[in-house]
Structure formats: C-alpha cells, structure tokens
Amino acid sequence: MARTKQTARKSTGGKAPRKALATKAARKSAIVTGSVKKVHRFRPGTVALREIRRYQKSTELLLRKLPFQRLVREIAQDFKTDLRFQSAAIGALQEASEAYLVGLFEDTNLCAIHAKRVTIMPKDMQLARRIRGERS
C-alpha cells in the first residue's frame, strides 16, 4: 500500500485528527494509475538529532508562556489564595524552570549512556536526581 506524505502541524495538545475515509479511496485509485511518488523518509533518529542541534542553538523559551503561567498560579493556590504575579516574576520562574529541566535531562541522558543505552528511562532520572542530592 502506498504511503501518503505527512505535513508538519503544530500540536494542539488534543487527540490527533482522524483521516477522512475519502483518502483511502483516493489512494487506491492512485495505485492503479501508478502516479504515486515514493515519500522520502529519514532514518530513525536523524530528525531527533536535528531537533537537538536546533534547540541547543536557540535561546527562546521552550515551554509556552500561558500554560506555564497557569501551572504557576495553580501551584501558588495551595499556599495562598488571590496571589498576584508580575509578568517579570513569571518570566524569571520560567527561565529558572527551563534551565533546571534542561540540566536534569542532560544528566539523565548521561546516566542512560553510562548504562549503554540511548533511550532515557525513569530510573535514569531518579539516579541523576539522587547523585545531585535532590532526592535520597
């Protein structure tokens, strides 16, 4: 069966959109005519490495601002109700949070590599936090 070309879409956080049934019939008719061009696919891991290099070069924030702001406000509700935040304060919290997470993922990746794996697992993150002294 011929493959169809996939285009990059921005994630909305919900379920992936379902393909229409009409595409199946269109694909079958295209196979008969033989006009389907083979789709170029990168080898597994190539796109991941490209994304790693891209995000290591960039300096912009990786988490969206509004979802992060909602999370901060939700956590702050547990301590005191009706707290107000300056936008600079939330920006500083986001910078610090992202720097912490990036460092943690770097250490987690080193733990996975030490175990002769390329896939990080929860036990790698637990080991990284334990070595850092964050959790016993």
From Swiss-Prot:
Pfam families: Histone
GO cellular component, one term: nucleus
Nucleotide-binding as UniProt keyword: no
Regions that span the bilayer: none
N6-acetyllysine modification, residue list: K5, K10, K15, K24
Keyword ATP-binding: no
Record localization: Nucleus; Chromosome
N6-methylated lysine modified-residue sites: K5, K10, K28, K37, K80
InterPro entries assigned: Histone-fold, Histone_H2A/H2B/H3, Histone_H3/CENP-A
An MF annotation (GO) of this entry: DNA binding
Keywords tagged on the record: Acetylation, Chromosome, DNA-binding, Methylation, Nucleosome core, Nucleus, Phosphoprotein
Post-translational modification: Acetylation is generally linked to gene activation. Methylation at Lys-5 is linked to gene activation. Methylation at Lys-10 is linked to gene repression.
PTM sites of type Phosphoserine: S11, S29
SUPFAM superfamilies from the UniProt entry: Histone-fold
Residue span of region Disordered: 1-20
PANTHER family on file: HISTONE H3 (PTHR11426)
Protein family (similarity comment): Belongs to the histone H3 family.
The protein's assembly and partners: The nucleosome is a histone octamer containing two molecules each of H2A, H2B, H3 and H4 assembled in one H3-H4 heterotetramer and two H2A-H2B heterodimers. The octamer wraps approximately 147 bp of DNA.
Function: Putative variant histone H3 which may replace conventional H3 in a subset of nucleosomes. Nucleosomes wrap and compact DNA into chromatin, limiting DNA accessibility to the cellular machineries which require DNA as a template. Histones thereby play a central role in transcription regulation, DNA repair, DNA replication and chromosomal stability. DNA accessibility is regulated via a complex set of post-translational modifications of histones, also called histone code, and nucleosome remodeling.
Listed name of the protein: Histone H3.3-like type 2
Organism: Caenorhabditis elegans
Lineage, opening ranks: Eukaryota, Metazoa, Ecdysozoa, Nematoda, Chromadorea
UniProt gene name: his-74
